[in-house]
């Protein structure tokens, strides 16, 4: 059984914007890659590069730190960007600004519930391992039938349903 301490941690949580409903990709305004400073479309998922990442109320070091993420590899969604700053949204719906160097293009996801990793992308395929809720997994790929291939920190690699993951819907 795979286990994980809290997949994310915050110091002094503070709501920065109005409450955000569950992520619904139909309600996300997409900006094409040719219209962003990075050359990548927004929104998109990335992960935290460091164990500690300061999240600020605005896109500069002059803005106060709202909270600090304490989980390397945590998936976040970029919802806006400037040349050096990215506005991110986490699994809780909180939004804050972080510096571009604190983010990695490596794709990770969070298991929303205890999740089976299966040998093949089928519900009746052999179970290889189980994860607990809030486990961060590396996203390898997703297929058109709603299954994603993921890898655990312990090296287990298998398939799980896309709907059981946060960070795989774009």
Predicted regions and their residues:
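Short, small/polar residue-rich loop motifs at catalytic or cofactor-binding pockets
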Residues: 62-63, 123-124
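SH3-family beta-barrel domains
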Residues: 10-57, 68-72, 79-82, 86-119, ...
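N-terminal signal peptide c-region/cleavage motif recognized by signal peptidases
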Residues: 4-6
